[in-house]
Regions:
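Conserved glycine-rich cofactor-binding loop
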Residues: 12-16
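Conserved glycine-rich Rossmann-like NAD(P)H-binding loop of the short-chain dehydrogenase/reductase
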Residues: 28-44
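The beta1-alpha1 cofactor-binding region of Rossmann-like NAD(H)/NADP(H)-dependent oxidoreductases
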Residues: 39, 60-71, 103
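Substrate-binding pocket helix/loop in short-chain dehydrogenase/reductase
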Residues: 97-98, 102-110
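Active-site helix of classical SDR
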Residues: 121, 157
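Residue(s) in the substrate-gating loop at a strand-loop-helix junction
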Residues: 141
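SDR active-site lid
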Residues: 173-248
Length: 248
């Protein structure tokens, strides 16, 4: 994909991997639409892109709200006339044993982490299919293959996103579409996601093993847009978890 006057939408762009991905595309001269719930974090991400000479549009958006997602998409279309890449990265998580989880908390994780990807993908397809081009990138996790204790809601969502993405890819292939769909299976990331998580324990929940810088996700997303792989397994710990699950 050529990088001339391109537009990317990044959800979950206020912090962590989403912000790193947005900054990566901004440094390359892309127009970047930033979607997240927190206006202050969005403003900081926008300023970071503009400081490197990039162009950014900050749109406070709850990805669990389909009307808000479509409204954000429409604002991008009005501002820039098209969307070349849509990166789904927004997430919520819940830490605790299954028997203690409240249905409303579990539902919120599903609405943001799964349905947010569904709504984002649909919003992107509505503008990409008429022009028969574009790329959708789903930020996944090794937990899309290997579920772990105490994060049942998040793991269920990542498994579901993988199934949803595979179905979408098959539909586009059947159409002969030029739209690519890639899923990046990430390792544990050094982000503030567990500071945001609803945690039923008194102590902080932290990934075991190596934690990767969010810039690793940014480079993987950049590669996915230009190479259109079905999946990328990113980082040794993610590869070991996925392959180990397949073998044992």
């Amino acid at each position: 994909m050529s990088d001339t006057a391109k537009t990317v939408v990044v959800t979950g762009a206020g912090a962590g991997a989403g912000r790193a991905i947005a900054a990566r595309f901004g440094r390359e001269g892309w127009r970047v639409a930033l979607l997240s719930r927190d206006p202050d974090r969005l403003a900081a991400a926008k300023a970071e892109i503009e400081a490197t000479g990039g162009e950014a549009l900050a749109i406070p958006t709850d990805m669990a709200d389909v009307a808000a997602v479509k409204s954000a998409r429409d604002q991008v279309m009005q501002a820039w006339g098209g969307i070349d890449v849509w990166v789904n990265c927004a997430m919520a998580t819940l830490v605790g044993p299954i028997h203690e989880l409240k249905p409303k908390d579990f539902r919120r994780v599903v609405e943001v982490t799964l349905m947010g990807y569904v709504y984002g993908s649909q919003a992107a397809l509505e503008v990409m299919r008429p022009v028969n081009r574009g790329a959708i990138v789903q930020i996944g996790s090794a937990l899309a293959y290997r579920a772990i204790p105490l994060q049942s809601a998040y793991c269920a969502c990542k498994f579901a996103i993988r199934g949803f993405t595979d179905s979408l890819r098959c539909e586009l292939l059947h159409e002969g579409s030029n739209i690519s769909v890639s899923m990046l299976q990430m390792p544990g990331m050094n982000t503030i996601q567990f500071d945001w998580a609803k945690n039923l324990f008194d102590h902080k929940y932290q990934p075991v093993g190596d934690e990767f810088d969010p810039d690793v996700a940014a480079e993987a997303a950049w590669r996915a847009v230009h190479e259109a792989p079905r999946e990328l397994w990113v980082g040794g710990s993610a590869i070991k978890a996925i392959v180990g699950q397949m073998v044992y």
